[in-house]
A protein has these predicted regions:
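Bacterial N-terminal signal peptides
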Residues: 5-17
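Short, glycine-/small- and polar/acidic-enriched structural segments
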Residues: 23-174, 178-184, 196-207
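A bilobed periplasmic-binding-protein/Venus flytrap-type ligand-binding module shared by bacterial periplasmic
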Residues: 43-44, 109-119, 209-225, 274-277
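Pocket-lining segment of extracytoplasmic ligand-binding domains
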Residues: 166-257
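Secondary-structure end/capping motifs
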Residues: 221-303
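Conserved C-terminal helix/tail region of periplasmic/extracytoplasmic solute-binding proteins
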Residues: 291-330
Length: 330
């Protein structure tokens, strides 16, 4: 009887053992852009946060938000970090398993950059503008920004799909295009080469779920604990991003091969102003995308922003005191 009693106690203690004592759970994130706004997984890896939260994490880069959405629906990743209208279009068309669980950025910070005598938006008529992909953040921003100057795609300008921000910069520097839509820190690299802003995006304050954490409701149901641990890792990475620029510079320097501190300073100072410290989901950011999709698909008019999101992990991080613990009450 004593032996059985000791065994029962031992099993009970094992059940109460901290999560770190258990085997790490495999977890895959796909991200779509090599930019500061999508640097949280890089920061988490550098800081050992995935290990802290008992995740055996794999990070995969695919330079297309539409392909990332297809991969998500195909069942490959546990989480995606992406922007663009792809996820919303898929939801509107019936893929309602998609769920946004957090956002790193809810405003657009792209910029339209050119050289020579191209100074005003009107000067871009007839030009080809480099964007990463059709349907990407840079594509959407260019349309929205130039629409404010009564300019429309195909009628007044066309696009070159480069594949990503670094590739758009390469096309600009090589003379393949005269205009490019770029995001920090790539825009600052162009400025250092003598190019200039035609439109400075942050001034426009265009609401948009530009960088979000997107998964599937079925994955949440199957792996709620792993999802909760992942979001806490991202929460801590966000704290590092906002409070320790030296770590951010180290990570960006490694990932983007940038060692010019003036470029990193300019990029960080511009981007950090619009990053969400607590990964907030904002209705207006999703409504902006729904409004755009509704121009070609009436079904988007019936979708409410709240239907796209699942804030359970953010709510738990708030109620449990997680945010207050890492930020300090303020």
């Amino acid at each position: 009887m004593i032996g059985r009693g000791l065994l029962a106690v031992a099993l009970g203690l094992l059940a109460l053992a901290p999560i770190k004592a258990r085997a790490a759970e495999k977890f895959t994130t796909i991200y779509s852009a090599r930019v500061m706004a999508q640097a949280l997984p890089w920061i988490a890896e550098d800081a050992g946060l995935f290990k802290k939260y008992n995740l055996d994490h794999s990070l995969v880069f695919i330079a297309s938000s539409s392909i990332v959405t297809a991969a998500l629906l195909g069942g490959d990743p546990d989480m995606t970090m992406t922007g663009g209208v792809g996820n919303v279009i898929a939801f509107v068309r019936g893929s309602t398993d998609i769920a946004y669980v957090g956002s790193a950025k809810n405003l657009m910070t792209q910029n339209i950059i050119a050289g020579g005598n191209l100074k005003r938006p009107e000067d871009l008529k007839g030009k080809r503008i480099a964007v990463s992909r059709i349907g990407s953040n840079s594509h959407y921003f260019t349309i929205q920004a130039l629409r404010r100057h009564n300019m429309e795609p195909n009628r007044d300008y066309t696009f070159l799909q480069s594949g990503g921000d670094p590739e758009s910069l390469t096309a600009l520097l090589a003379g393949g295009v005269e205009v490019a839509c770029l995001t920090p820190p790539t825009d600052v690299q162009a400025l250092s080469r003598g190019y200039h802003y035609v439109i400075y995006g942050p001034d426009l304050k265009i609401p948009y779920a530009a960088t979000s954490f997107v998964t599937k409701r079925s994955t949440i149901a199957r792996r709620p604990q792993a999802m909760a641990q992942y979001m806490r890792a991202m929460g801590e990475a966000s704290k590092i991003m906002h409070s320790d620029r030296e770590v951010v510079y180290k990570v960006l320097g490694k990932q983007l091969r940038i060692d010019d501190r003036s470029i990193l300073d300019a990029a960080y100072n511009a981007e950090i102003k619009v990053m969400e410290p607590r990964l907030a989901l904002k209705a207006e950011a999703f409504q902006a995308i729904l409004d755009e999709v509704a121009q070609t698909d009436d079904r988007a008019k019936k979708v409410k922003p709240q239907e796209l999101t699942d804030p359970r992990f953010l709510n738990d991080m708030e109620k449990s005191g997680f945010w207050d613990q890492i930020w300090g009450k303020r």
